[in-house]
Amino acid sequence: MMTQANTYFYNGADVALLNGQYTDVFSLLGMHTSEDGKSLIVRCFLRNAFKVDVISIKDGRRVAGLEKVNDAGLFAGTMGRRVKPFLYLLRIQYPLSQIEIVDPYQFGPLLNADDLYLFGEGSAERAYKFLGANWRDVEGIEGVHFCVWAPNAKRVSVVGDFNHWDDTQHVMRQHMANGLWEIFLPNVAEGAHYKFDLVHPNGERHAKSDPMATQMECAPHNASIVPKKSKHSWKDTLWMNKRAVTAWHKAPMAIYEVHLGSWRRKGDNGEQYLDYQDLIEQLIPYVKAQGFTHIELMPISEYPFDGSWGYQPVGLYAPTHRFGDANGLKAFVDACHQADIGVVLDWVAAHFPKDPHGLVRFDGTCLYEHEDPRKGTHPDWDTLIYNYGRGEVRSFLLSNACYWLREFHFDGLRIDAVSSMLYLDYSREPGQWLPNAYGGRENLEAISFLQMLNQRLYQAFPGICMIAEESTAFAGVTKPTDHHGLGFGFKWNMGWMNDSLSYLSRDPIYRQYHHHQLTFSLMYAYTEQFMLSVSHDEVVHGKGSLLHKIPGDDWQKFATLRAYYGFMWGHPGKKLLFMGSEFAQRDEWDHNHSLDWHLLAFEPHQGVQRWLKDLNQLYQGMSALSVLDYQPAGFRWLDCDNGSASIFTFVRYGLAGDAPLVFVINMTPSVHHGFRIGLPQAGDFCEYLNSDSYLYCGSNQGNAGLVVAQNQPWQGMESSALITVPPLSCLVLGLAANQVEAKRR
């Protein structure tokens, strides 16, 4: 005679299910037609329940009670005379309570064949729409669709608040062909905590955070969080339309790099982060008043270690909890756009950390990383390198980039550590790396990925800016992909940065012997579309602040810094400056503390801040400073060889009819009276800016706001003038308004 168990569970399926070894649970649990086709059978597994009834969702009536097959929690039963499947819920009685749930095992697969194909191919741009935790409506029932990629796992369950973290309750459906696991759970609340519980090929169990989670717990906790259903209502249409038609390589771009956790803090002891609403009220007006065109946010994907500054993210899709939720971040970006400020996001695609709840050996195998440490481990940071040749990994990264640009309206990505992606021998000794298929050192898979990424993003999101932090001489970083380039819009000019900061640190007496450090960058300025960056990396790890790098007394330090900024803003290329540098922060940056805003009580710091503000105003108002940034016609040296005086003079040109600007940079404390410079034409030239003005806390030497050029050729120009060059200064001269009008006529 058959027992209850083998009436409903054949071939030992009940034992396998109880032991967590039955992977095809959807073929067993839920509603199924009997073998003879004459009845419906419902099976479920509910620990600690003692009675289960099946209730029709359509009319709310009880259809049948299920038999308790064993004390472990297996229930099963037939649905009377019904032979047509119907939607149902389970009324479950526990010793002290009764609940009703919609049985998740009655639903079929929800994954789309096209999505699966693109994901495996490596070209899925919206993988976050079907992977992770997404709200879905299935046959009129609302719930959360969980999906994860784990092709080598023997079993995957979703565990969380909603099932008491029981790995046997919600075993997921496996798609053998592509390694995806899914389940639709109607009985989950927004804000619920969850993880994926995986049985590895060796039989070990590990709980992992959702790689596609859009919200995560605060460290040291690491559960993923079911997202809210509410959506942000965008109000940035004007900006998005303007962005789409803006040629940024011809437009002014002055980027303010920000670490949100330390720009400013609140609380009695500065122990609290500003939230997004605080940042809307404080950061945006400040950036606007200072004249910056963009904000660049250091990484905001969830990261457990504060000291990584976000460059070792574990939750690549989850905005960090530190400043608020996803809707708060969207509101911040929206407010920036309404203030006519763009927002660029630092994006980390070069490596990921080894935190055990993260991507490392996700399903018990090297899924996201390479198996061989010679390709899969980063020696500098002890992190793991993505396997860029694997389609699913490419889709994971491509979709993440699209996620930030599409869902959060970011205006571009600054990709961190591109150099480490491009070379297989990056930071490795001989014997520690594997050559490519042609015997070379280039990482062909990473190069292919970056080309694909840039091509697709520029096509999908008009007007964005893709920026590379790339420190080598790799050719074609900003060349179009159809010309065999990487396809970036801009590349950080690390050579200019290193040379110019080295020059800055030298005593003025010896700068004459290092004159080339400020002129050499113009030898290669047009080989890429460069961005001049003085980033956070230059004011940490014992390097000191910019002010600290400069020798001399305080007066010389401040004057030199103002002159340096003048040179930077006059030099071809877009601009990026790290927060605090705009008012000459004295101490190097500390991510644990706010910037030293109290310094603005002192005039020298006010002077530097005002100088940057006026430089930005001139930069945005004079097209000669941006429209021909990447064409040799936009720049001309007047004298690049005056090393003995450490004076640099050059002209910036715009399009026909645009007024040129003349820059005079003096990097010694000497004053030069009767100093002749060439000028584009005879007539009146305004002294637009003078960094030595009393307005900037200088010594107030100069030309009283006006220079008159005579018809005396000089330095290849048809006219010239005798001027006073103040100490450690930057002068910017431009045609007076009447001269500009005359020239246009």
Swiss-Prot record:
The UniProt entry, under InterPro entries, shows: A-amylase/branching_C, Branching_enzy, GlgB, GlgB_N, GlgB_N_E_set_prok, Glyco_hydro_13_cat_dom, Glyco_hydro_13_N, Glyco_hydro_b
Recorded catalytic activity of this chain's protein:
Transfers a segment of a (1->4)-alpha-D-glucan chain to a primary hydroxy group in a similar glucan chain
| Recorded GO CC terms | cytosol
| Originating species | Shewanella putrefaciens (strain CN-32 / ATCC BAA-453)
Q: Which UniProt keywords apply?
A: Carbohydrate metabolism, Glycogen biosynthesis, Glycogen metabolism, Glycosyltransferase, Transferase
Q: In which pathway does it act?
A: Glycan biosynthesis; glycogen biosynthesis
GO terms for biological process? glycogen biosynthetic process
Extract the Pfam families matched here: Alpha-amylase, Alpha-amylase_C, CBM_48, GlgB_N
* Record note on quaternary structure: Monomer.
This protein's gene is called glgB
Please name the GO terms that the record assigns under molecular function.
Answer: 1,4-alpha-glucan branching enzyme activity; cation binding; hydrolase activity, hydrolyzing O-glycosyl compounds
> SMART domains this protein is in?
Aamy (SM00642)
Question: Any idea what this protein is called?
Answer: 1,4-alpha-glucan branching enzyme GlgB
Enzyme category, top tier:
transferase
Q: Which residues form the active site?
A: D416 (nucleophile), E469 (proton donor)
Quote the EC number: 2.4.1.18
Membership in a protein family: Belongs to the glycosyl hydrolase 13 family. GlgB subfamily.
